[in-house]
């Protein structure tokens, strides 16, 4: 079926074999390449469609967001266009993160604007709770360790999402990771001060203020800050714990705060974390995602392989000493849908196994059978002197780890030495295509950019021109990228031990959570590179330009620098 995007079309559904709507004569192929297949969601200011990109082999599915201001007022149209261009610029900037949909295209057609994004198959957290029941305390902590690094990344790009809610968090079916969607309400901190017309700027901002109940007071007053996303994340935690929307939770008549604590039973320490996330006053709320993670005193989802970040030798993690949760009171899992169901298809979801395993980190993870999930792999190497299985909670449909029809199995291997751990990590890699420099460059020349999770050990790409490659979580141990062009490359969570980046152009590359032990970055261009939480122990930055790189002094203490190294923020050599 083809679907007409004309908002005034009386019969938008059309057969597959036509290119012009039979009812209104409107073209069914946007920009000459996107064949619209169906409506995913709509609102007063636009609609979202599923489409097939007929210009690419295999006609891959994508998401087309239409912004359709129905007005003759040139000022309103101009503001709508600014909103469209703002979202396009933001998506282009933050879409480099593997858990944010990539922007594929954007264009204007007949006074309507279109954004084309990567299609993410899976269920959102709102659907997950409605189908499978509420989360345990441990599962909500796991959620926080995954969503907070995403927020930390988009905030580092000077972007406030402004619409964090369960409906905008999809658990990707292919790997069970959360993907943050719908940047339609973003507030670009850089561009927000460029408009001299205050009334027009206010009207433009008012188009997309967020979702009532999830947006904090300062955001409703058109003055969002980074901590506004922290508040919305806290409200999302409440929904995961209770199944209740903010409208279903009473407010204190004197303070205006949500009276949520009577609806849940969690440890006092975790309750304090949520309480501070939900502070109405920005002054008393957590200011950043990292502050929340520090308060949780538990490793992030990605930290299983990043324990070498500390200056001490590799050791088994110890527990955080959290009080155990005593249970979760069930909320109404059939609460009405408050969010836009826009960018996803329906997919089958396996029933949830409500059992959970308590590790000595204080994290309780939900488990199912028979394969181990990526979420569980992040914590499976943590030594646990005793493993307790929590009794099944009284959930509406049983429990599950996530959507997508993938089963799981929790394993508890013995702790490894560092060398054994590295060997085991390579042995546990899924079977993937065997790569060498020739096959890699051939695939790149044909348009391939996604090399995530691939086994690229020892690959030689010296002097290669491969900007924009995605090597997220790939194994690149002993690879050679000397003098390569790697602008905007994504090496997030990649294994990069002893990799040669000597003289390479790595400007605006992402190395979040990567293992760069012993890597050679001498003379490399590292302007705008993000090394957040990367392990730089023994990495050589002699003569490298770190002037605008995001890296902490603590990380650099573990690395090698010399007098020719341009240090962060200084603009001058050491």
Curated annotation (Swiss-Prot):
The active site is at residue 163. The keyword Methyltransferase does not apply. CDD domains: STKc_PknB_like. Residues 454-493, 504-543 form the Pentapeptide repeat domain. This is Serine/threonine-protein kinase B. ATP binds at residues 40-48, 65. Residues 319-407 are annotated as: Disordered. Its EC number is 2.7.11.1. It catalyses: L-seryl-[protein] + ATP = O-phospho-L-seryl-[protein] + ADP + H(+); L-threonyl-[protein] + ATP = O-phospho-L-threonyl-[protein] + ADP + H(+). It holds the Pfam family Pkinase.
């Amino acid at each position: 079926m083809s679907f007409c995007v004309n908002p005034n079309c009386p019969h938008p559904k059309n057969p597959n074999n036509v290119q012009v709507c039979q009812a209104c004569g409107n073209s069914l192929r946007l920009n000459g390449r996107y064949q619209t297949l169906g409506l995913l969601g709509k609102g007063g200011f636009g609609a979202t469609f599923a489409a097939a990109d007929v210009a690419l082999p295999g006609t891959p599915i994508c998401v087309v967001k239409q912004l359709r201001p129905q007005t003759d007022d040139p000022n309103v149209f101009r503001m709508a266009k600014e909103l469209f261009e703002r979202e396009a610029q933001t998506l282009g900037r933050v879409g480099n993160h593997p858990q944010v949909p990539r922007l594929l295209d954007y264009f204007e057609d007949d006074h309507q604007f279109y954004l084309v994004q990567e299609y993410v198959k899976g269920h959102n957290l709102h659907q997950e709770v409605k189908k499978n029941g509420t989360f345990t305390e441990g599962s909500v902590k796991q959620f926080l360790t995954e969503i907070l690094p995403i927020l930390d990344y988009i905030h580092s790009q000077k972007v406030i999402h402004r619409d964090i809610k369960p409906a905008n968090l999809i658990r990707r079916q292919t790997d069970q990771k959360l993907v943050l969607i719908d940047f339609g309400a973003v507030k670009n901190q850089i561009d927000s001060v460029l408009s001299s017309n205050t009334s027009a700027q206010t009207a433009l901002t008012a188009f997309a203020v967020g979702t009532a109940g999830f947006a904090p007071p300062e955001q409703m007053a058109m003055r969002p800050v980074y901590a506004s996303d922290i508040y919305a994340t806290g409200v999302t935690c409440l929904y995961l714990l209770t199944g209740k929307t903010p409208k279903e939770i009473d407010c204190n008549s004197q303070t205006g705060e949500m009276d949520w604590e009577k609806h849940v039973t969690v440890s006092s320490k975790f309750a304090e974390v949520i309480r501070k996330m939900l502070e109405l006053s920005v002054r008393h709320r957590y200011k950043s995602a990292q502050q929340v993670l520090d308060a949780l005193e538990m490793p992030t989802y990605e930290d299983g392989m990043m324990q070498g970040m500390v200056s001490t030798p590799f050791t088994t993690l110890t527990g955080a000493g959290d009080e155990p949760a005593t249970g979760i009171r069930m909320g109404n899992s059939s609460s009405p849908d408050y969010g836009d169901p826009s960018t996803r298809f329906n997919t089958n979801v396996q029933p949830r196994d409500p059992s959970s395993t308590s590790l000595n980190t204080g994290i309780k993870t939900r488990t199912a059978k028979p394969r181990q999930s990526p979420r569980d792999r992040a914590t499976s190497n943590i030594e646990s002197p005793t493993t307790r299985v929590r009794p099944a909670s009284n959930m509406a449909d049983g429990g599950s780890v996530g959507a997508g029809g993938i089963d799981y199995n929790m394993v508890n291997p013995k702790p490894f030495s560092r060398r054994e751990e590295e060997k085991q990590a390579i042995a546990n890699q899924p079977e993937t295509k065997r790569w060498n420099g020739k096959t890699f460059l051939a695939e790149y020349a044909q348009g391939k950019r996604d090399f995530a999770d691939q086994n690229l050990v020892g690959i030689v790409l010296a002097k290669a021109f491969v900007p924009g490659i995605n090597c997220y979580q790939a194994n690149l141990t002993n690879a050679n990228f000397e003098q390569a062009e790697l602008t905007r490359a994504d090496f997030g969570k990649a294994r990069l031990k002893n990799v040669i980046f000597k003289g390479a152009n790595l400007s605006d590359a992402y190395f979040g959570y990567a293992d760069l032990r012993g890597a050679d970055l001498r003379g490399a261009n590292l302007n705008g590179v993000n090394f957040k939480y990367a392990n730089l122990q023994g990495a050589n930055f002699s003569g490298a330009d770190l002037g605008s790189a995001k890296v902490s002094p603590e990380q650099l203490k573990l690395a090698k620098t010399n007098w020719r190294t341009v240090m962060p923020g200084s603009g001058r050599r050491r």
